[in-house]
Amino acid sequence: RLGYMIKCKGINPENILTVTYTKAATGDMGERFYSFFAGSIPMPVFRTINSLCVSVIKLYERLKGTTAFDLVTDDKITGLIIREGYKKHMKDFPTEGDIKDIHTAISYVKNMMLKEDSFTDDDIGVKGFKKIYKYYNDKLREKRLMDYDDQMVYAHTILVKYPRILKFFSDKFKYICVDEAQDTSKIQHRIIKLLTAQNGNIFMVGDEDQSIYGFRAAYPEALVNFEKEYKNAKVLLMEKNYRSSQEIVKVADGVIQKNKDRHPKNMQAVSKNKGRVNFIKTAGSAAQYMELLKTAKNHKGETAVLFRNNESAIPLINLLEKEKIPFSYRQTDGAFFSNRVVTDILNVIKFAQNPSDTELFMQIYYKINSILKLSRAAAEGACDEASATGRTIPQVLCANPLYRRGKDTAIFANVIKNVNTRKPGQFIAEVYNTLGYGEYMENMHYPAQKINILISVATQEKTMRDFLLRMIALEDIVRNRQYNGTDFILSTVHSSKGLEYETVYLMDIQDGILPSVNMFDDPKLYEEERRLFYVAMTRAKKELNIFDLNQSGRASFTLEAAGVLTGKGETVTKNIPKVYDRINHRQFGAGTVIAADGDFITVSFDGGRTRKFSFKVLREKGLLLMNKSAKNGQ
């Protein structure tokens, strides 16, 4: 299209701006343009949105005779500011995962153009975020620094406030083309819209069905509403899939069509290859890992194992390393090993091995407090007494009536005492169940996946010492593993976007993982999870294998994909409860339907909770009992 604009329409290439998502993409597009036209026509301008924003800020500097803040290019600097803000406001030390989550949340807020008074910590999903966010921005301004997101915020402000600067860029770039538009954020779309307002020449290429970066503030609504946003706009649908075989395209298309916020499309495979979609039934995660281990040993040709979260790969990596089977791992992330849940469990193990360690006890006592029931003062008193008398802390707790809580204290002491007689996986399960750490996790809304992964690794080791050493070795493997080009590849779905593989295995397709926790509470987020599943399926060229763990009923997305193949995958509308109907949920008890929207119902439970569910999933998992209408006292 760029070549046509320049060669056939006589448009000056200097007046064409093509915006791509990353710096690498600008280079790639420039090379592809040159390979097409071999220098026969001049090169148009390829830029990232941040590069464009730098130009806006520099022009502002020249016109106003001022100097902009310095750009922070090192994440360690912004990470240090976040760390200090966290310590100040949370009175605790952040983990690697905490800093990463806050970094992502800061970028999200700026890209979504959210004002500080328009959101809460719960909206963002990060405890203490608003105070840390303010601290972070104040420190940047104090040091006359800006981050990459600030570049866009400042450039947008300049373009809005100074028509002269906006006109300069509108005159310069009369034609704007945007690649990968589904990954573009709200503020980026606003900047692009400002620049195109004068000339009205905008061309976007994107697929809202592949918008999977909502946590980075990707804004697929701009594509869905393209005709409303831009006068005289036209949408052309690309409905041919050039990668995947027929059955894969059929299943993937059948799943994604359940999303509402999209342009209606009917994808067709160009390939004449029928291909295969298989559902591999296993009894649970451990059986899934063993199946993948067999696959790694016997696979032929390029094979990828895809998963939602980096940590899903850890038990599999553990097995592959033990068996010395070569594999590649794309974009490794070792945040699992510094996660609070993992650190807590390891601290309990270390305390059990040295039950006189007062520092460790003070770090863990309140996390197993459903059994200990100690105030901070009591915990400190027990530590002081242990130090003074030379006894262990469990001995002090059992002997002193000030700290003893009936049988519970003895249970705690017994679990700690038996650390080296229990198998590692068994001991972790006892910490979770018997010592009440699971209750603490539930109160903190921590997902159970990390405990399950720890137990998966622990069950491969004979002694606690072996387990602790293995965790150290695994962390080194995960953090330092390089992509080495072998044809058995492990990757998150996000890292696999834009790539393709002959054969794909999708692991951990479970409610709570993919789709992730609490997605039924928000249909919009649930649709993004479905898009992620769609992207995962369409990485496969010839064969797609989806694990069906069958632990507590089939996963929502497994049901949808299997339903497309069997012809029984239509959304269930029959017998959907109406407003005022009474229902009985096997977990939450009795409640009243207060809203119904398509497949989704919102229920106010008698216990005080209000939750949103997919009726189809409730029915298929046997979680729902229907009662009579509550209206008019019936």
List the predicted regions and their residue ranges.
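Conserved helicase core region in the C-terminal RecA-like lobe
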Residues: V45-S55, C177-E180, V205, N309, ...
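Conserved helicase NTPase motor core
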Residues: L17-T18, A25, V45, I77, ...
